[in-house]
C-alpha cells in the first residue's frame, strides 16, 4: 500500500476518534507515531471496535485505520468516526444473515477488515 509506505517515509503521527453508535463509547487513539504502528493504540481500537453483542474483540487490520484516517483528512472532517459496525463474531454474523440478505456469509467484518462508519459533517456520497 503506497499510503502506508508514505506514512513510514514521512514519519506521520496518526490519531483518530471513534464513537461507537451501539455502545456509546468514544475513544481517541494515536495508532501510528513516527510512521510506525503503536501497539497500545491498536489494542485500544481493537477493544473499541469489538463485537458489541458479545464483547469479543479481534485484532483489526491496522491498514483499515490508515484508510479511515486518509478519508477523514481528504474530506476535511474534524468529527469523530461514528461507527455503526466493525468486528462481528461468526455467531453474530450468522444471526444477522438470518435477518438480512445484505450480510455476506464471509463478511470482512469477521476478519477485522471492515468498519461501517459515517462522519456527521460529511455527506456519505463524498466518502
What are these regions (language model features)?
Residues 1-10:
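N-terminal twin-arginine translocation
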Residues 8, 14-127:
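Cell-envelope/glycan interface and biosynthesis
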Amino acid at each position: 500500500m503506497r499510503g502506508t509506505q508514505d506514512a513510514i517515509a514521512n514519519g506521520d503521527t496518526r490519531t483518530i476518534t471513534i464513537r461507537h453508535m451501539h455502545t456509546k463509547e468514544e475513544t481517541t487513539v494515536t495508532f501510528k507515531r513516527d510512521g510506525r504502528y503503536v501497539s497500545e493504540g491498536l489494542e485500544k481500537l481493537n477493544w473499541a471496535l469489538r463485537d458489541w453483542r458479545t464483547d469479543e474483540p479481534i485484532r483489526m487490520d491496522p491498514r483499515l485505520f490508515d484508510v479511515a484516517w486518509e478519508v477523514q483528512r481528504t474530506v476535511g472532517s474534524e468529527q469523530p468516526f461514528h461507527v455503526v459496525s466493525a468486528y462481528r463474531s461468526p455467531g453474530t454474523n450468522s444471526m444477522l444473515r438470518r435477518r438480512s440478505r445484505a450480510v455476506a456469509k464471509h463478511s470482512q467484518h469477521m476478519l477485522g477488515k471492515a468498519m461501517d462508519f459515517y462522519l456527521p459533517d460529511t455527506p456519505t456520497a463524498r466518502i
